Amino acid sequence: MRLLGLMLGRYIGALICGGAWLASATPVGLLDVAQLIATSDAIAVGKIASVQRTGRGTVTITDQAIGANEFKAELTVNRIIKGPPDSRRMEFTFYLPDAPVAFQSIARGDAGMFFLREISGRYYISDPHYPRIAAVEQCASSEPLPVLDRVTVELRCALTDPSAPETIQLGAIEALESIRTDPATDALKLAAISPSTSVRLRAIAALLGRNEISELGSVQDLLLQPVAGPLRGAVDRLASGIWHGVRNPKAIPILERLLRSPDFKVRRGAAQALRNTGSSQAVAGLAEALNDSERDVRYIAVIGLGEITRQDEWSPSIDNFSEHEAYFLSYWRNWVKSQK
């Protein structure tokens, strides 16, 4: 019985014993390409030539044993990113539990960049939630690079290949979101000028999430309009990127305008970003947010003003604010007036 360390979301511990796969799993997390690389002995770009069911096993998830089918897949390799350099075909094993869990299936014809872990001379999927990420058939790199940078080059190729479908491009952006390097940011900037609206907005949201505000102005008009149904997901991602990533004081003028958006999530993200700047230039915008129709936005304004002006005693907990909202709003409105 040998230990097989697989990443399942954040981590998984697994045991291989006589064809059975026994895993102690945590809930699936976001894709983390750097972690996926670290847990993989081989990374190959290619296409699945065949998949065969080879037996039965057991998967234990959160202390519950679940029966699973064992499969063997044969991968036709286009190029190796990490691992045996001369491989043209690779075989690996994966498991699909009988119960509905977030393991990804693998089928003949599936293509991409596959991440594999070697145990006793056999390859297994490194992460059943993310067995592969986006890649295209052709991608040339003229210089030797660290593995993370090589993976980034592959994702960039997936974004710039004119024959790549939109689903591949969106998958590449999802993977690039977790790579916090300059080459990854540069690749996202290319995607941010894509003729595809879905690709462009997804890339801009990813850039905002890393405090890259060069394209914030290009989505300002969209965020200031009522959200059309098909764009709901895109606007939510943009608002989330602003909330979690933007802290550059140069964004303050646009953030102030976004406080007038008809969409609550956009206003909330803008208020949080103003707070995150930590700049005295954000005070005017936060003062405006004190009058927002949504309590969450008003609370962010109060906390942001307290942090920026270093008045900790007027930065209440959410519970304290809920009980005494009028008291805190009155203080900050009067304070703002006194500064004029």
Predicted feature locations:
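Conserved hydrophobic register position within alpha-solenoid helical repeats
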Residues: A172, A203, A234-A239, A270, ...
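Alpha-helix N-cap/helix-start positions at coil->helix boundaries
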Residues: A164-T167, D182, T197-S198, A228-G233, ...
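Alpha-solenoid repeat junctions
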Residues: L176, R180, L207, N211, ...
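OB-fold (S1/OB) nucleic-acid-binding surfaces
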Residues: T62-F92
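Extracellular C-terminal loop/segment signatures of secreted glycoproteins
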Residues: Y95-A175, D182, I193
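Short, conserved beta-turn/loop elements at beta-strand boundaries and strand-helix junctions
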Residues: V51-T58, I81-G83
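Terminal, low-structured helical/coil segments at or just beyond the last alpha-helical repeat
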Residues: E313-K340
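Amphipathic alpha-helical scaffolding segments comprising HEAT/armadillo-like alpha-solenoid repeats
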Residues: L148-T160, T181-I193, E212-P226, V246-R260, ...
